[in-house]
């Protein structure tokens, strides 16, 4: 069986990995073996954090809504329940945006929630 030399193919593959590791600290951006491990790990972090980002933003929106709701003497859960009873279907992202940028509109929604809870 003849000897197989992977010259250009192997070099190209390794060069691609080292290029992906550009900017990494120490030997991680120089040595193929270490760079390969670092790149693989970075892919794992990226995959995990794309999912975690959705959770993080939801937590941020809830914290902002809760802070604005408490200025109206409502807890987050009471506000959300009141909005549901009032038939106001607004998502947390929009509600958090109103709480930060347009407090008057948020207060109107909070008043609607209070009235619905009082019934």
UniProtKB/Swiss-Prot annotation:
Pfam families: Ribosomal_L20 (PF00453). One of its GO terms (molecular function) is rRNA binding. Coiled coil: none annotated. PROSITE patterns: RIBOSOMAL_L20. Keywords: Ribonucleoprotein, Ribosomal protein, RNA-binding, rRNA-binding. The keyword Ribosomal protein applies. GO terms for cellular component: cytosolic large ribosomal subunit. One of its GO terms (biological process) is ribosomal large subunit assembly. Belongs to the bacterial ribosomal protein bL20 family. Binds directly to 23S ribosomal RNA and is necessary for the in vitro assembly process of the 50S ribosomal subunit. It is not involved in the protein synthesizing functions of that subunit. NCBIfam families: rplT_bact (TIGR01032). HAMAP family: Ribosomal_bL20. This is Large ribosomal subunit protein bL20. The gene is rplT.
């Amino acid at each position: 069986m003849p000897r197989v030399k992977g010259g250009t193919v192997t070099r190209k593959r390794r060069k691609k990995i080292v290029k992906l590791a550009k900017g990494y600290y120490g030997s991680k951006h120089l040595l193929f073996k270490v760079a390969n491990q670092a790149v693989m790990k970075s892919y794992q972090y990226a995959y995990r954090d794309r999912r975690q980002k959705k959770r993080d933003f939801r937590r941020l929106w809830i914290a902002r809504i809760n802070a604005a709701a408490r200025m109206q003497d409502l807890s987050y859960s009471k506000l959300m329940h009141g909005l549901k009873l009032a038939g106001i279907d607004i998502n947390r992202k929009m509600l958090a945006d109103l709480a930060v940028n347009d407090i008057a509109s948020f207060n109107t929604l909070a008043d609607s929630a209070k009235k619905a809870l009082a019934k």
